[in-house]
Protein backbone atom coordinates (compact mmCIF):
# COMPACT_ATOMS: atom_id res chain seq x y z
CA UNK A 1 0.00 0.00 0.00
CA UNK A 2 1.24 3.51 -0.78
CA UNK A 3 0.87 6.76 1.15
CA UNK A 4 1.89 10.30 0.34
CA UNK A 5 5.06 11.94 1.61
CA UNK A 6 5.24 15.60 2.65
CA UNK A 7 6.52 16.56 -0.79
CA UNK A 8 3.59 15.04 -2.60
CA UNK A 9 5.12 11.87 -3.98
CA UNK A 10 3.91 8.33 -3.35
CA UNK A 11 5.68 6.45 -0.59
CA UNK A 12 6.12 2.69 -0.87
CA UNK A 13 6.06 1.00 2.51
CA UNK A 14 7.95 -2.09 1.49
CA UNK A 15 9.37 -3.75 -1.61
CA UNK A 16 6.96 -5.86 -3.63
CA UNK A 17 7.20 -9.63 -3.79
CA UNK A 18 9.81 -10.99 -6.13
CA UNK A 19 8.59 -11.27 -9.72
CA UNK A 20 9.51 -13.93 -12.25
CA UNK A 21 12.63 -12.78 -14.07
CA UNK A 22 10.77 -12.20 -17.32
CA UNK A 23 8.41 -9.72 -15.62
CA UNK A 24 11.19 -7.55 -14.20
CA UNK A 25 11.32 -4.24 -16.08
CA UNK A 26 15.11 -4.17 -16.04
CA UNK A 27 15.27 -7.57 -17.77
CA UNK A 28 12.57 -6.62 -20.26
CA UNK A 29 14.38 -3.42 -21.22
CA UNK A 30 17.69 -5.27 -21.45
CA UNK A 31 16.19 -7.87 -23.81
CA UNK A 32 14.52 -5.11 -25.83
CA UNK A 33 17.81 -3.24 -26.20
CA UNK A 34 19.65 -6.39 -27.33
CA UNK A 35 16.91 -7.10 -29.87
CA UNK A 36 17.02 -3.47 -31.00
CA UNK A 37 20.78 -3.67 -31.55
CA UNK A 38 20.41 -6.90 -33.53
CA UNK A 39 17.61 -5.53 -35.72
CA UNK A 40 19.45 -2.26 -36.32
CA UNK A 41 22.67 -4.08 -37.15
CA UNK A 42 21.30 -6.93 -39.27
CA UNK A 43 18.46 -5.09 -40.98
CA UNK A 44 19.06 -1.32 -41.15
CA UNK A 45 16.28 -0.93 -43.71
CA UNK A 46 13.72 -2.43 -41.32
CA UNK A 47 15.13 -0.55 -38.33
CA UNK A 48 14.74 2.82 -40.05
CA UNK A 49 11.12 2.12 -40.94
CA UNK A 50 8.93 5.00 -39.69
CA UNK A 51 6.89 2.58 -37.59
CA UNK A 52 9.99 1.38 -35.74
CA UNK A 53 11.07 4.97 -35.13
CA UNK A 54 7.56 5.75 -33.92
CA UNK A 55 7.96 3.26 -31.06
CA UNK A 56 10.77 5.28 -29.51
CA UNK A 57 9.28 8.66 -30.41
CA UNK A 58 5.89 7.63 -29.06
CA UNK A 59 7.34 6.69 -25.71
CA UNK A 60 9.20 10.01 -25.50
CA UNK A 61 5.92 11.83 -26.22
CA UNK A 62 4.20 9.87 -23.46
CA UNK A 63 6.90 11.02 -21.05
CA UNK A 64 6.63 14.63 -22.25
CA UNK A 65 2.87 14.43 -21.74
CA UNK A 66 3.24 14.34 -17.96
CA UNK A 67 6.13 16.80 -17.54
CA UNK A 68 4.00 19.86 -16.78
CA UNK A 69 1.66 18.27 -14.21
CA UNK A 70 4.57 16.51 -12.48
CA UNK A 71 6.59 19.71 -12.12
CA UNK A 72 3.56 21.70 -10.98
CA UNK A 73 2.44 19.20 -8.35
CA UNK A 74 5.86 18.44 -6.88
CA UNK A 75 7.05 22.07 -6.77
CA UNK A 76 3.78 23.39 -5.32
CA UNK A 77 3.57 20.61 -2.75
CA UNK A 78 7.23 20.96 -1.82
CA UNK A 79 6.98 24.71 -1.24
CA UNK A 80 3.57 24.59 0.46
CA UNK A 81 4.76 22.00 2.98
CA UNK A 82 7.84 24.04 3.89
CA UNK A 83 5.58 25.82 6.38
CA UNK A 84 6.27 22.82 8.60
CA UNK A 85 9.85 24.12 8.85
CA UNK A 86 8.58 26.86 11.16
CA UNK A 87 7.94 24.19 13.78
CA UNK A 88 11.57 23.16 13.77
CA UNK A 89 13.09 26.65 13.68
CA UNK A 90 16.07 27.01 11.42
CA UNK A 91 16.10 23.44 10.06
CA UNK A 92 14.16 24.22 6.90
CA UNK A 93 16.39 27.10 5.85
CA UNK A 94 19.56 25.17 6.65
CA UNK A 95 18.33 22.19 4.64
CA UNK A 96 17.50 24.34 1.61
CA UNK A 97 20.89 26.08 1.79
CA UNK A 98 22.61 22.69 1.89
CA UNK A 99 20.48 21.38 -0.98
CA UNK A 100 21.29 24.32 -3.23
CA UNK A 101 25.03 24.27 -2.51
CA UNK A 102 25.50 20.52 -2.96
CA UNK A 103 23.12 20.34 -5.95
CA UNK A 104 25.18 23.08 -7.59
CA UNK A 105 28.33 21.01 -7.02
CA UNK A 106 26.64 18.04 -8.70
CA UNK A 107 25.49 20.10 -11.69
CA UNK A 108 28.88 21.75 -12.13
CA UNK A 109 30.69 18.41 -11.80
CA UNK A 110 28.57 16.94 -14.59
CA UNK A 111 29.19 19.98 -16.77
CA UNK A 112 32.96 19.93 -16.20
CA UNK A 113 33.30 16.19 -16.86
CA UNK A 114 31.08 16.45 -19.94
CA UNK A 115 33.35 19.14 -21.39
CA UNK A 116 36.60 17.39 -20.50
CA UNK A 117 35.44 14.05 -21.92
CA UNK A 118 33.06 14.81 -24.83
CA UNK A 119 31.95 11.22 -25.53
CA UNK A 120 29.11 12.43 -27.79
CA UNK A 121 31.44 13.82 -30.45
CA UNK A 122 31.59 11.75 -33.59
CA UNK A 123 28.09 10.32 -33.35
CA UNK A 124 26.89 12.90 -35.89
CA UNK A 125 23.23 12.23 -35.18
CA UNK A 126 20.83 14.33 -37.20
CA UNK A 127 17.15 14.42 -36.23
CA UNK A 128 14.58 14.80 -38.99
CA UNK A 129 14.75 18.27 -40.55
CA UNK A 130 11.02 18.73 -40.07
CA UNK A 131 11.27 17.98 -36.37
CA UNK A 132 14.04 20.51 -35.85
CA UNK A 133 13.03 23.28 -38.26
CA UNK A 134 10.37 24.80 -36.02
CA UNK A 135 12.77 24.86 -33.06
CA UNK A 136 15.56 26.47 -35.06
CA UNK A 137 13.22 29.07 -36.55
CA UNK A 138 11.78 29.83 -33.13
CA UNK A 139 15.22 30.22 -31.57
CA UNK A 140 16.50 32.52 -34.31
CA UNK A 141 13.89 35.12 -33.42
CA UNK A 142 14.37 34.86 -29.66
CA UNK A 143 16.31 37.65 -27.95
CA UNK A 144 17.25 37.91 -24.27
CA UNK A 145 14.32 40.20 -23.46
CA UNK A 146 11.94 37.87 -25.29
CA UNK A 147 13.34 34.93 -23.33
CA UNK A 148 12.56 36.50 -19.96
CA UNK A 149 9.17 37.83 -21.07
CA UNK A 150 8.34 34.38 -22.43
CA UNK A 151 8.73 32.96 -18.92
CA UNK A 152 5.54 34.83 -17.98
CA UNK A 153 2.53 32.98 -19.44
CA UNK A 154 -0.33 34.89 -20.98
CA UNK A 155 -2.58 32.39 -19.24
CA UNK A 156 -2.03 29.50 -16.86
CA UNK A 157 -3.99 27.18 -19.13
CA UNK A 158 -1.82 28.22 -22.06
CA UNK A 159 1.36 27.36 -20.14
CA UNK A 160 0.12 23.82 -19.53
CA UNK A 161 -1.31 23.44 -23.02
CA UNK A 162 2.01 24.40 -24.64
CA UNK A 163 4.00 22.40 -22.11
CA UNK A 164 6.25 25.42 -21.52
CA UNK A 165 8.34 24.25 -18.56
CA UNK A 166 9.58 27.65 -17.37
CA UNK A 167 6.08 29.10 -17.47
CA UNK A 168 4.73 26.16 -15.49
CA UNK A 169 7.61 26.51 -13.02
CA UNK A 170 6.93 30.22 -12.48
CA UNK A 171 3.26 29.61 -11.80
CA UNK A 172 4.05 26.62 -9.56
CA UNK A 173 6.48 28.66 -7.45
CA UNK A 174 4.01 31.55 -7.02
CA UNK A 175 1.15 29.15 -6.31
CA UNK A 176 3.24 27.23 -3.78
CA UNK A 177 4.13 30.36 -1.80
CA UNK A 178 0.52 31.55 -1.93
CA UNK A 179 -0.67 28.18 -0.64
CA UNK A 180 1.97 28.24 2.10
CA UNK A 181 0.71 31.66 3.22
CA UNK A 182 -2.81 30.26 3.65
CA UNK A 183 -1.60 28.09 6.51
CA UNK A 184 -4.25 25.70 7.82
CA UNK A 185 -6.87 27.15 5.47
CA UNK A 186 -4.94 25.62 2.58
CA UNK A 187 -4.80 22.15 4.14
CA UNK A 188 -7.51 20.63 1.94
CA UNK A 189 -6.05 22.11 -1.23
CA UNK A 190 -2.60 20.75 -0.32
CA UNK A 191 -4.17 17.33 0.11
CA UNK A 192 -5.79 17.60 -3.32
CA UNK A 193 -2.47 18.52 -4.93
CA UNK A 194 -0.72 15.67 -3.08
CA UNK A 195 -3.38 13.24 -4.32
CA UNK A 196 -3.06 14.64 -7.83
CA UNK A 197 0.69 14.09 -7.68
CA UNK A 198 0.03 10.52 -6.58
CA UNK A 199 -2.26 9.98 -9.57
CA UNK A 200 0.22 11.54 -12.01
CA UNK A 201 2.97 9.26 -10.74
CA UNK A 202 0.52 6.43 -11.29
CA UNK A 203 0.34 7.53 -14.92
CA UNK A 204 4.14 7.36 -15.09
CA UNK A 205 4.00 3.83 -13.67
CA UNK A 206 1.62 2.87 -16.48
CA UNK A 207 3.73 4.60 -19.13
CA UNK A 208 6.88 2.87 -17.88
CA UNK A 209 5.32 -0.50 -18.75
CA UNK A 210 5.85 0.51 -22.37
CA UNK A 211 9.55 1.17 -21.73
CA UNK A 212 10.74 -2.09 -23.37
CA UNK A 213 8.83 -1.25 -26.55
CA UNK A 214 10.20 2.27 -26.58
CA UNK A 215 13.72 1.04 -25.85
CA UNK A 216 13.54 -1.45 -28.72
CA UNK A 217 12.34 1.18 -31.19
CA UNK A 218 14.83 3.82 -30.07
CA UNK A 219 17.83 1.46 -30.09
CA UNK A 220 16.90 -0.24 -33.37
CA UNK A 221 16.48 3.10 -35.13
CA UNK A 222 19.68 4.54 -33.61
CA UNK A 223 21.80 1.56 -34.70
CA UNK A 224 20.03 1.22 -38.05
CA UNK A 225 20.53 4.87 -38.96
CA UNK A 226 23.91 5.64 -37.41
CA UNK A 227 25.49 2.19 -37.47
CA UNK A 228 26.98 -0.02 -34.73
CA UNK A 229 29.60 2.66 -34.07
CA UNK A 230 26.87 4.57 -32.20
CA UNK A 231 27.08 1.92 -29.47
CA UNK A 232 30.54 3.14 -28.54
CA UNK A 233 29.25 6.64 -27.86
CA UNK A 234 26.30 5.36 -25.82
CA UNK A 235 28.42 2.98 -23.76
CA UNK A 236 30.87 5.83 -23.26
CA UNK A 237 28.11 8.00 -21.80
CA UNK A 238 27.02 5.24 -19.39
CA UNK A 239 30.61 4.64 -18.23
CA UNK A 240 31.24 8.36 -17.86
CA UNK A 241 28.08 8.81 -15.79
CA UNK A 242 28.98 5.88 -13.53
CA UNK A 243 32.46 7.29 -12.95
CA UNK A 244 31.17 10.82 -12.32
CA UNK A 245 28.53 9.62 -9.85
CA UNK A 246 31.17 7.57 -8.00
CA UNK A 247 33.46 10.60 -7.93
CA UNK A 248 30.66 12.70 -6.44
CA UNK A 249 29.76 10.14 -3.75
CA UNK A 250 33.29 9.27 -2.67
CA UNK A 251 34.84 12.74 -2.99
CA UNK A 252 32.15 15.41 -2.55
CA UNK A 253 29.91 13.50 -0.13
CA UNK A 254 33.01 11.89 1.36
CA UNK A 255 34.45 15.31 2.24
CA UNK A 256 31.12 16.37 3.78
CA UNK A 257 31.03 13.16 5.82
CA UNK A 258 34.62 13.68 6.95
CA UNK A 259 33.76 17.24 8.01
CA UNK A 260 30.90 15.99 10.17
CA UNK A 261 33.03 13.19 11.58
CA UNK A 262 32.04 9.91 9.92
CA UNK A 263 33.29 7.68 7.11
CA UNK A 264 31.33 7.61 3.85
CA UNK A 265 32.19 3.93 3.25
CA UNK A 266 30.86 2.94 6.69
CA UNK A 267 27.73 4.97 6.00
CA UNK A 268 27.18 3.14 2.71
CA UNK A 269 27.58 -0.14 4.59
CA UNK A 270 25.01 1.00 7.15
CA UNK A 271 22.37 1.70 4.48
CA UNK A 272 23.35 -1.23 2.24
CA UNK A 273 19.89 -2.84 2.45
CA UNK A 274 18.21 0.37 1.33
CA UNK A 275 20.72 0.66 -1.50
CA UNK A 276 19.88 -2.87 -2.65
CA UNK A 277 16.16 -2.07 -2.62
CA UNK A 278 16.84 1.03 -4.69
CA UNK A 279 19.05 -0.93 -7.09
CA UNK A 280 16.26 -3.39 -7.74
CA UNK A 281 13.56 -0.76 -8.30
CA UNK A 282 15.56 2.09 -9.89
CA UNK A 283 13.66 4.38 -7.50
CA UNK A 284 15.28 6.11 -4.54
CA UNK A 285 11.80 6.61 -3.13
CA UNK A 286 11.22 2.87 -2.68
CA UNK A 287 13.46 2.89 0.41
CA UNK A 288 12.28 6.21 1.87
CA UNK A 289 10.54 4.90 5.03
CA UNK A 290 13.38 2.49 5.82
CA UNK A 291 15.96 5.25 5.31
CA UNK A 292 14.12 7.60 7.67
CA UNK A 293 13.96 4.94 10.39
CA UNK A 294 17.65 4.09 10.06
CA UNK A 295 18.71 7.74 10.16
CA UNK A 296 16.82 8.21 13.41
CA UNK A 297 18.59 5.17 14.86
CA UNK A 298 21.86 6.61 13.60
CA UNK A 299 21.47 9.61 15.90
CA UNK A 300 19.66 12.19 13.77
CA UNK A 301 16.79 13.98 15.49
CA UNK A 302 13.27 12.96 14.49
CA UNK A 303 12.30 16.53 13.54
CA UNK A 304 15.29 16.90 11.21
CA UNK A 305 14.73 13.50 9.59
CA UNK A 306 11.02 14.23 9.14
CA UNK A 307 11.75 17.47 7.29
CA UNK A 308 15.01 16.90 5.44
CA UNK A 309 14.44 13.45 3.93
CA UNK A 310 11.00 14.03 2.32
CA UNK A 311 11.97 17.53 1.16
CA UNK A 312 15.22 16.17 -0.23
CA UNK A 313 13.28 13.91 -2.58
CA UNK A 314 12.24 17.02 -4.49
CA UNK A 315 15.07 19.44 -3.72
CA UNK A 316 18.19 17.30 -3.34
CA UNK A 317 18.58 14.77 -6.17
CA UNK A 318 22.33 14.76 -6.75
CA UNK A 319 22.37 11.82 -9.16
CA UNK A 320 19.67 13.42 -11.30
CA UNK A 321 21.61 16.70 -11.34
CA UNK A 322 24.79 15.01 -12.61
CA UNK A 323 22.76 13.13 -15.21
CA UNK A 324 21.05 16.27 -16.52
CA UNK A 325 24.20 18.22 -17.30
CA UNK A 326 26.08 15.20 -18.66
CA UNK A 327 23.19 14.04 -20.85
CA UNK A 328 22.46 17.56 -22.11
CA UNK A 329 26.08 18.00 -23.23
CA UNK A 330 26.11 14.50 -24.77
CA UNK A 331 22.98 15.22 -26.81
CA UNK A 332 24.35 18.57 -27.97
CA UNK A 333 27.63 16.90 -28.98
CA UNK A 334 25.80 14.07 -30.76
CA UNK A 335 23.67 16.54 -32.71
CA UNK A 336 26.65 18.72 -33.56
CA UNK A 337 25.22 21.69 -31.65
CA UNK A 338 27.93 23.82 -30.06
CA UNK A 339 26.87 25.27 -26.72
CA UNK A 340 28.53 28.55 -25.79
CA UNK A 341 29.72 29.32 -22.28
CA UNK A 342 26.64 31.46 -21.65
CA UNK A 343 24.39 28.63 -22.85
CA UNK A 344 26.13 26.22 -20.49
CA UNK A 345 25.63 28.65 -17.63
CA UNK A 346 21.97 28.73 -18.66
CA UNK A 347 21.91 24.93 -18.39
CA UNK A 348 23.05 25.25 -14.77
CA UNK A 349 20.47 27.89 -13.93
CA UNK A 350 17.61 26.08 -15.65
CA UNK A 351 18.62 22.69 -14.21
CA UNK A 352 18.60 24.19 -10.71
CA UNK A 353 14.91 24.89 -11.28
CA UNK A 354 13.82 21.85 -13.28
CA UNK A 355 15.59 19.46 -10.91
CA UNK A 356 13.21 20.65 -8.22
CA UNK A 357 10.45 19.02 -10.24
CA UNK A 358 12.14 15.63 -10.15
CA UNK A 359 11.14 13.00 -7.65
CA UNK A 360 12.57 9.70 -6.57
CA UNK A 361 10.42 7.51 -8.85
CA UNK A 362 11.55 5.44 -11.77
CA UNK A 363 11.84 7.49 -14.96
CA UNK A 364 11.69 10.89 -13.25
CA UNK A 365 15.27 11.69 -14.29
CA UNK A 366 14.37 11.28 -17.95
CA UNK A 367 11.28 13.46 -17.45
CA UNK A 368 13.44 16.16 -15.87
CA UNK A 369 15.94 15.95 -18.72
CA UNK A 370 13.10 16.61 -21.14
CA UNK A 371 12.14 19.72 -19.20
CA UNK A 372 15.73 20.97 -19.11
CA UNK A 373 16.27 20.48 -22.85
CA UNK A 374 12.97 22.17 -23.69
CA UNK A 375 13.84 25.17 -21.54
CA UNK A 376 17.49 25.56 -22.60
CA UNK A 377 17.30 24.85 -26.32
CA UNK A 378 14.24 23.14 -27.84
CA UNK A 379 16.37 22.02 -30.80
CA UNK A 380 17.94 19.49 -28.41
CA UNK A 381 14.63 17.79 -27.58
CA UNK A 382 14.61 15.39 -30.59
CA UNK A 383 17.96 14.08 -29.36
CA UNK A 384 16.26 12.55 -26.32
CA UNK A 385 15.61 9.44 -28.39
CA UNK A 386 19.39 8.91 -28.62
CA UNK A 387 19.87 8.53 -24.87
CA UNK A 388 16.53 6.92 -24.06
CA UNK A 389 17.74 3.44 -25.01
CA UNK A 390 20.42 3.53 -22.32
CA UNK A 391 18.51 5.58 -19.75
CA UNK A 392 17.58 2.46 -17.81
CA UNK A 393 21.25 1.68 -17.21
CA UNK A 394 21.76 5.15 -15.74
CA UNK A 395 18.54 5.11 -13.74
CA UNK A 396 19.92 2.78 -11.06
CA UNK A 397 23.00 4.92 -10.45
CA UNK A 398 20.88 8.08 -10.39
CA UNK A 399 18.69 6.53 -7.69
CA UNK A 400 21.64 5.20 -5.67
CA UNK A 401 23.34 8.61 -5.74
CA UNK A 402 20.08 10.34 -4.81
CA UNK A 403 19.40 8.23 -1.73
CA UNK A 404 23.03 8.44 -0.57
CA UNK A 405 22.96 12.22 -1.01
CA UNK A 406 19.77 12.57 1.01
CA UNK A 407 21.15 10.37 3.78
CA UNK A 408 24.33 12.43 4.08
CA UNK A 409 22.27 15.65 3.90
CA UNK A 410 20.17 14.57 6.87
CA UNK A 411 23.21 13.73 8.99
CA UNK A 412 24.85 17.05 8.04
CA UNK A 413 21.78 19.18 8.85
CA UNK A 414 21.36 17.33 12.17
CA UNK A 415 25.00 18.13 12.96
CA UNK A 416 24.57 21.75 11.84
CA UNK A 417 21.51 22.10 14.04
CA UNK A 418 23.38 20.57 17.01
CA UNK A 419 20.96 17.64 17.18
CA UNK A 420 23.26 14.80 16.07
CA UNK A 421 24.06 12.12 18.66
CA UNK A 422 27.70 11.39 17.82
CA UNK A 423 27.88 8.44 20.22
CA UNK A 424 24.99 6.68 18.49
CA UNK A 425 26.40 7.66 15.10
CA UNK A 426 29.73 5.96 15.70
CA UNK A 427 28.21 3.05 17.63
CA UNK A 428 26.05 2.18 14.62
CA UNK A 429 28.64 2.82 11.92
CA UNK A 430 31.44 0.98 13.72
CA UNK A 431 29.51 -2.22 14.30
CA UNK A 432 27.86 -4.87 12.17
CA UNK A 433 24.14 -4.16 12.12
CA UNK A 434 22.08 -6.82 13.86
CA UNK A 435 19.76 -8.71 11.47
CA UNK A 436 16.79 -7.80 13.65
CA UNK A 437 17.57 -4.13 13.07
CA UNK A 438 17.50 -4.66 9.33
CA UNK A 439 14.17 -6.45 9.58
CA UNK A 440 12.82 -3.58 11.64
CA UNK A 441 13.99 -1.10 9.01
CA UNK A 442 12.41 -3.03 6.16
CA UNK A 443 9.05 -3.45 7.89
CA UNK A 444 8.80 0.09 9.20
CA UNK A 445 6.32 2.38 7.46
Curated annotation (Swiss-Prot):
Keywords attached to this entry: Cell inner membrane, Cell membrane, Membrane, Symport, Transmembrane, Transmembrane helix, Transport
Pfam families (UniProt xref): SDF
Topology of the protein relative to the lipid bilayer: Multi-pass membrane protein
Gene3D superfamilies xrefs: Sodium:dicarboxylate symporter
Disulfide bonding pattern of the chain: none
Keyword Nucleotide-binding: no
Top-level taxon of origin: Bacteria
Subcellular location: Cell inner membrane
GO cellular component: plasma membrane
Segments passing through the bilayer: 24-44, 62-82, 105-125, 163-183, 201-221, 237-257, 322-342, 370-390
GO molecular function terms listed in the Swiss-Prot or TrEMBL record: fumarate transmembrane transporter activity; malate:proton symporter activity; succinate transmembrane transporter activity
GO biological process: L-aspartate transmembrane transport
Keyword Cell inner membrane: yes
Primary localisation category: membrane
Entry's family note: Belongs to the dicarboxylate/amino acid:cation symporter (DAACS) (TC 2.A.23) family.
Protein's job: Responsible for the transport of dicarboxylates such as succinate, fumarate, and malate from the periplasm across the membrane.
Name of the featured protein: C4-dicarboxylate transport protein
Organism expressing this protein natively: Rhodopseudomonas palustris (strain HaA2)
Lineage: Bacteria, Pseudomonadati, Pseudomonadota, Alphaproteobacteria, Hyphomicrobiales
Gene for this chain: dctA
